[in-house]
């Protein structure tokens, strides 16, 4: 099937030295298995990690020490990563999941997306809803929050960039962009079909959309789960909204 096992330390502060060593050994034994965890969402958490792992220079160094930074390793948040830590992510091939609704809900701050993806040490970033503290599983609402996060750094996020994060960007971060994340011959065709006029407000606003870019921007700012008209998994329809 398409399901995969994932090596998942809850996060460094709740993991013992022995647990992390065992997970690192497992990662070394199975180099193609994804790794998923959490890093640098808030400042108190970072101080906690420093107290628990005094022999490590910073938060990312903890995961690096145990062999848990590598391609297909995805870490949620990363709001407060230093330049040195971003360099470690770049060099190792590890990636970030940007979870803006969680960050806003907890008052943790917001990710400076362009700082992560541009420059001479780019890091792959996908868009995530989070589970415990995320406020919506709608990717449209998550794109809305990502736009606001970018605005808080004075670096606007275009509709094209947001939709990339939610599709191809996520696939790149997970190391599966050869299978999903774009519409092309040979891809596995995991698709969400959007109704651009799914609510009375969207129907009204779309009358004034001048081009595709504006139409997509309207969806990410005003849309929610009601916009999803149908979904396909591996080319097979698995959901269709009732008329």
Predicted regions and their residues:
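Histidine/acidic residue-rich metal-binding segments in metalloenzymes
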Residues: 1-95, 107-125, 178-181
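Fold-independent oxyanion-binding glycine-rich loops
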Residues: 10, 39-40, 77-79, 92, ...
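Conserved protein kinase catalytic core
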Residues: 44, 83, 136, 201, ...
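Short, flexible, mixed-charge acidic loops at enzyme active sites
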Residues: 51-56, 137-142, 207
């Amino acid at each position: 099937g398409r399901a995969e096992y994932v090596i998942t330390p809850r996060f460094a502060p709740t993991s013992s030295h022995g647990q992390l060593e065992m997970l690192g050994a497992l990662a070394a034994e199975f180099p193609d298995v994804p790794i998923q965890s959490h890093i640098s969402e808030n400042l108190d958490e970072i101080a906690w990690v420093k107290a628990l792992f005094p022999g490590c220079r910073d938060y990312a160094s903890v995961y690096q020490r145990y062999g848990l930074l590598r391609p297909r390793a995805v870490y949620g948040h990363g709001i407060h990563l230093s330049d040195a830590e971003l360099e470690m992510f770049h060099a190792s091939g590890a990636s970030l999941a940007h979870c803006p609704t969680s960050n806003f809900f907890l008052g943790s701050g917001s990710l400076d997306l362009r700082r992560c993806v541009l420059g001479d040490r780019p890091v792959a970033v996908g868009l995530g809803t989070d589970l415990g503290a995320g406020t919506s599983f709608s990717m449209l609402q998550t794109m809305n929050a990502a736009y606001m996060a970018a605005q808080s750094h004075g670096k606007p996020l275009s509709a094209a960039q947001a939709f990339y994060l939610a599709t191809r960007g996520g696939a790149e971060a997970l190391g599966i962009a050869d299978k999903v994340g774009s519409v092309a011959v040979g891809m596995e065709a995991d698709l969400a079909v959007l109704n651009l006029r799914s609510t009375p407000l969207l129907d009204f606003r779309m009358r004034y959309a001048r081009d595709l870019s504006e139409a997509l921007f309207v969806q990410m700012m005003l849309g929610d789960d009601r916009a999803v008209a149908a979904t396909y998994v591996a080319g097979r329809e698995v959901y269709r909204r009732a008329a």
